[in-house]
Amino acid sequence: MPVAATNSETAMQQVLDNLGSLPSATGAAELDLIFLRGIMESPIVRSLAKVIMVLWFMQQNVFVPMKYMLKYFGAHERLEETKLEAVRDNNLELVQEILRDLAHVAEQSSTAAELAHILQEPHFQSLLETHDSVASKTYETPPPSPGLDPTFSNQPVPPDAVRMVGIRKTAGEHLGVTFRVEGGELVIARILHGGMVAQQGLLHVGDIIKEVNGQPVGSDPRALQELLRNASGSVILKILPSYQEPHLPRQVFVKCHFDYDPARDSLIPCKEAGLRFNAGDLLQIVNQDDANWWQACHVEGGSAGLIPSQLLEEKRKAFVKRDLELTPNSGTLCGSLSGKKKKRMMYLTTKNAEFDRHELLIYEEVARMPPFRRKTLVLIGAQGVGRRSLKNKLIMWDPDRYGTTVPYTSRRPKDSEREGQGYSFVSRGEMEADVRAGRYLEHGEYEGNLYGTRIDSIRGVVAAGKVCVLDVNPQAVKVLRTAEFVPYVVFIEAPDFETLRAMNRAALESGISTKQLTEADLRRTVEESSRIQRGYGHYFDLCLVNSNLERTFRELQTAMEKLRTEPQWVPVSWVY
């Protein structure tokens, strides 16, 4: 078969070589010869010639082994060389850029509007998200086969399994690995996602480091880290491989609710390997194998680093030193110590604000969602900071898109009042019964009458196809922050004292307001604003400083428009 194949290919090549002398010998037109050469050089014609040759062998009852058949057609080479790779793994971001560009022309072009509609379809978005997940290989590794012997991996490593690994680096450059002592040996404890070693893939967790540039490493992890950090040029590591299967990162994203600086952390195994972040940052957790230290990276990009785990940070924040005091009869040096008895409390809704102050906020798992419209817009802020003015302006600006609830009250209606216009009127007994049944988002009493917002009123506005705009107390956000109401929480922050005083003075002069606030009132507003931000800042999606009502309103409009065109990070409980 190989001989026949060679002869057939040689014959075709001879025809091609002789085409150059055909014009003078046959008088053929040059254009026709070019056409003939194209046919002869066509891969299809060459394949047909090979098929004819194979059919001839079959007619002659000549057996040809499959390996020669594959080699003859070149199939084995194509199978080895063909490797499909994704062009990119961030197609969702590309689509969002396209949608932003289409937003400018969608109103003038029906084709652009139709394209924008297709690109925002949930099925299409899910397809892109699945493609990006496969392209970036962020899928979970299947569990190991139960048939494998667990003791197999614990067998001693033969001496000939020692490997030499070469790495080129500059002095001071971190390799992205940490070490631990195990059985008197230095073992790779973790490999930081995105680091030099992780990118090269030459080292694995569990590998034993024996030598660095021919020098034994001993058993001190800090000394080895210092040696590797200061090394430059070519670094040769002598290792005993662990043969452990690497774990692919799982897609876990969290929103941080505290600031962290590894340089100030005395517990971190390696300060240089730590990842700094601030409250509100979004991180991807790429490794949670260690109970105390996770590996994470910022969603915007960059190398991974170590961060304290949920368990470690909870222990650290919950730890309170025992209050010690000397007993009345004790001496200065030899007296006994007694601890103050701690107060124990059961959770009560009436003590909701008290428990909020002691809530431990570490990480919140979130998920990235395609653009969608929120059902409620919640404005939080101190009294007198301008929440109600912003709510009214937003509803007047687009009454078809935004709406609000009608509050309920137990007071009797005035002669000029009508049911549902300004207030809904019910008896005090009925309202108290509904409050006990949990049908009110919030309620209060003023001059002997009850006032409140019913949860069903919010549902009614949402059912009408509108975004329900609410200006409520911060405690109410905990009730609203569910998959049913998917709120967008905006904190209206009070400006500094001088700006607030100037705003009140300008409102009086223009006739917008008739109430002159005292300095005590203004300072109370600033202090209350700071207190709300400290206690409930983890619930806020956006913070706006209301130093100018018109500018703040425009910023609020812009933020609401972005929700329709840009991806959003929401609590994972809203999705699953």
From Swiss-Prot:
Modified residues (Phosphoserine): 42, 145
L27 domain sequence ranges: 8-60, 84-142
Record-annotated Guanylate kinase-like domain positions: 374-561
PROSITE patterns: GUANYLATE_KINASE_1, GUANYLATE_KINASE_2, L27, PDZ, SH3
SMART domains noted in UniProt: GuKc, L27, PDZ, SH3
Localization in the cell: Cytoplasm, Cytoskeleton; Membrane; Cell projection, Dendrite; Postsynaptic density
Residues recorded as bearing Phosphothreonine in the entry: 141
Residue span, PDZ domain: 185-240
Record-linked InterPro entries: GK/Ca_channel_bsu (IPR008145), Guanylate_kin-like_dom (IPR008144), Guanylate_kinase_CS (IPR020590), L27_C (IPR014775), L27_dom (IPR004172), L27_dom_sf (IPR036892), MAGUK (IPR050716), MPP2_SH3 (IPR035602)
Effect of residue 363 to D: Enhances association with the cytoskeleton
Post-translational modification: Phosphorylated by SRC.
Record GO biological process: excitatory postsynaptic potential; long-term synaptic potentiation; protein homooligomerization
GO cellular component: cell-cell junction; cytoplasm; cytoskeleton; dendrite membrane; dendritic shaft; dendritic spine; plasma membrane; postsynaptic density
Keyword terms of this UniProt record: Cell projection, Cytoplasm, Cytoskeleton, Membrane, Phosphoprotein, Repeat, SH3 domain, Synapse
SH3 domain ranges (all copies): 249-317
Assembly mode: Can homomultimerise. Interacts with CACNG2. Interacts (via the SH3-Guanylate kinase-like sub-module) with DLG4/PSD95 and DLGAP1/GKAP. Interacts (via the PDZ domain) with CADM1 (via C-terminus). Interacts with KCNN2/SK2 (via N-terminal domain). Interacts with SRC.
Similarity comment text for this entry: Belongs to the MAGUK family.
Its job: Postsynaptic MAGUK scaffold protein that links CADM1 cell adhesion molecules to core components of the postsynaptic density. In CA1 pyramidal neurons, required for synaptic KCNN2-containing channel function and long-term potentiation expression. Seems to negatively regulate SRC function in epithelial cells.
Protein's UniProt name: MAGUK p55 subfamily member 2
Organism for this UniProt entry: Homo sapiens
Lineage: Eukaryota, Metazoa, Chordata, Craniata, Vertebrata
Gene: MPP2
